[in-house]
Amino acid sequence: MENAKMNSLIAQYPLVKDLVALKETTWFNPGTTSLAEGLPYVGLTEQDVQDAHARLSRFAPYLAKAFPETAATGGIIESELVAIPAMQKRLEKEYQQPISGQLLLKKDSHLPISGSIKARGGIYEVLAHAEKLALEAGLLTLEDDYSKLLSPEFKQFFSQYSIAVGSTGNLGLSIGIMSARIGFKVTVHMSADARAWKKAKLRSHGVTVVEYEQDYGVAVEEGRKAAQSDPNCFFIDDENSRTLFLGYSVAGQRLKAQFAQQGRIVDADNPLFVYLPCGVGGGPGGVAFGLKLAFGDHVHCFFAEPTHSPCMLLGVHTGLHDQISVQDIGIDNLTAADGLAVGRASGFVGRAMERLLDGFYTLSDQTMYDMLGWLAQEEGIRLEPSALAGMAGPQRVCASVSYQQMHGFSAEQLRNATHLVWATGGGMVPEEEMEQYLAKGH
C-alpha cells in the first residue's frame, strides 16, 4: 500500500497504527447488535444448524466403527469442558489483574480423529459431500444405517472422486484423514507455515501433500485452481464455505447441553464470555454463530489473533473485510501460531458475523508460549501455541471499564460470569515438538 493511502487509512482508523507496530491490541466492537438484529446478515438459520446436527447423527454409527476412538461417544465427535482454577490464579498473578467469574477450557485440542477444532468443520464437510454423492447415485437413503459406507462397494464408489483443500495444517489433517478413510483420493495444499509432523501424518494416511513456499492464501488459491480442472474433484473452500461453517456451528447446542449437565447457568445475571482463536475465520465464526443461537444475547464472543496475523480485526475494523490483507499494511504474517497464520480474512465470515462479535484482540507469539507453559505447569494440559490465543481474553475484558459500561455489566454480573477459552489444537503434537514449545515459555 503506498504511503498516501496508508496515511489516510491510519487517519481514519488510528488503531491500524498499533497493528502495524505489532502492539498487542484490543478492539471492543461498537457495532454489536442483538441476535435478532444481527441474525439476518448471516444468511443461515437455526434450521441449517439443525440439519447439520441431524447429518452428524446419521453418520455416527459409521464414525463409531471407522474411528474406534469415537466408539465410546457413539460416533459423536465432541470435546470435554473443564474448569481450570489453577490457571486462573496463575494468570491473575502474572498479569496482576483479577478475573471475575470462573475460567473454563473447551478442549477441542483433544477432539478425536484429528486433535483440533477442525475435526468439527472439516470432517463434517467431507461427510456432507460423501452423503450427497451416495444419495445421488442411489446407493444410500437417509434411513439407512450409514455404517454400510465401510463396505468395499462404497470404498470403490468413492475412489472415483477426489477432494482438495488448502491449509496451514489442522484443516488439512481433518479433511485428509476423513477423506482417505471414506475412500476419496485427497490432496492437501499446505502453506509454508505447516508443521512437518502434520505433513508426515497426512502422508501416512495416503494423502497427497503439495507444499508451497508461500502463505495460506497461495495454498488455497492453488488448491482451488487444481480442483477446477477435474470435474470429479471437490474443493473445500475454507474462505467461503457455508458447509464448513455449519459443521462448526453445531458446537453451540452441544456446549449448551454440557453446561446443563454441569449445572452451569447462562442468563442476563450470569453472562458467558467466549474467546476463540481466529485464522481465516470459518472455525470461530461458525462456533460463535452456534453459540449465539444457543445462548442468545447472554453470550459474548471475542476473536483472538497473533500480532503478526491480525487479518479479521483489520478487515472488520476498517470495513474492508477481504479487500485488505495484513501484508498490505506491511505486516509479515509470520507467527508460531501456524493455525492462525492468515493474512486475508474470510469476507463471508467477517460480513456475516461483524454485528454478533463483541471484540477482537491480538497477542504476541511470546505471550502464547508463556501461557502454554503456565497451563502445562498448573493444569497438566498441553496445547499448541495457537490454542492459547483465547487465554489472553479474560484479562482484557475484566480490565476494560469502557467495555463493561458499553454493555452495562454490573460488578455482580461479572462475578457470576463464565469465561470460556476455546482450545483449538495440540492434542496430537509429537512429544519432541511439545518440549520445544515448552522451552520457549517464560
Swiss-Prot record:
Task: Report the record's Gene Ontology biological process terms.
Answer: D-serine catabolic process; isoleucine biosynthetic process
A single Gene Ontology molecular function, please?
A: hydro-lyase activity
Which domain of life does this protein belong to?
A: Bacteria
Q: Which InterPro entries match?
A: D_Ser_am_lyase, Ser/Thr_Dehydratase, Ser/Thr_deHydtase_PyrdxlP-BS, TrpB-like_PALP, TrpB-like_PALP_sf
PTM sites of type N6-(pyridoxal phosphate)lysine: K118
The chemistry this enzyme catalyses reads:
D-serine = pyruvate + NH4(+)
Q: What is its EC number?
A: 4.3.1.18
Q: What is the required cofactor set for this protein?
A: pyridoxal 5'-phosphate
**Is Lyase one of the keywords UniProt gives this record?**
yes
Q: Which UniProt keywords apply?
A: Lyase, Pyridoxal phosphate
The enzyme class is: lyase
Complex formation: Monomer.
Q: Of which family is this protein a member?
A: Belongs to the serine/threonine dehydratase family. DsdA subfamily.
The name on file for this protein is D-serine dehydratase 2
Query: What phylogenetic lineage does the species belong to?
Result: Bacteria, Pseudomonadati, Pseudomonadota, Gammaproteobacteria, Enterobacterales
Gene symbol here is dsdA2
